[in-house]
Amino acid sequence: MDSITKTHDVYNLNAPKWEFFLRSYMGGNDYRDGNYLLKYILEDKHEYQKRIDLTPLDNHCKNVINIYSSFIWRLPPTRNFGNLVEDQALNSFLKDADMDGRSLNAFMSEAQMWSGVYGHVWLIMDKPAVIANTRADELAQEVRPYLTLITPENVLDWNYERALNGRYELTMLKVREWVEDDDAFYRIWEKDTIKGYEVIGEEAKLVETMDNPLGMIPAVCLYGNRSPIRGIGHSDITDVAYMQRAIYNELSEIEQLIR
């Protein structure tokens, strides 16, 4: 159980920051639920909640991220596919990159935006484990690769090793795919195997295992800004989020003085 839910040391250091940056970008109830107003010494719970409800948020974080993203994606990227330009599977992928209706451009625009919020996100490419007799059957059933975006709080552990050619390669990736009450599902990617564990309370059960035919982990870390630590990025709103919180508290003080 401990080995399944164990997290990277760097994850533990950064998880509170990721939550703060996410709430700062989302605003609204997400920000209010973070309780970022400084509490007065003799203030009770009801008074504190009332002050939170009365204090507006001027969301600078969302403005910074969205303006920067709109500037980058003002013109769509140009891609050269060579002989694959007429490939049916490729064109299906370009139109629906994540099997959820988002085109590749829309998916990458969203990935760029979230990497700006968190500092980085993970992109995993997978393909349904459906047996098709022919290529035509695959195309008919839309059995093709697709992308998944994983935000940092759901990538619990990872490991890089330097290959013989000097390049660093990802050798392990632990992803929390879903959580519901005390029930959670973890997928651990390695170069030779892919294992899925269901964790209920304190008990972990191996529910699926398969060979990894690629011999590599089909995942990349998309950085908003690189940090000195591999697998960790630097958020675009690192300073803005704290400035926004200070303004938020100052607005509360002004509102209290007026009242």
Question: Where would I find each of the regions flagged by the language model?
Answer:
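Extended, Lys/Arg-enriched charged tracts that mediate electrostatic binding to polyanionic substrates
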Residues: 104, 109-207
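Generic detector of solvent-exposed, compositionally biased contiguous segments
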Residues: 89-96, 145-163, 216, 221-228
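Intrinsically disordered, low-complexity regions of eukaryotic proteins
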Residues: 46, 55, 60, 179, ...
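Extended, helix-rich architectural segments
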Residues: 1-147
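Intrinsically disordered, low-complexity segments enriched in small/polar residues
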Residues: 25-26, 32, 80, 99, ...
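Extended, charged amphipathic alpha-helical segments
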Residues: 205-259
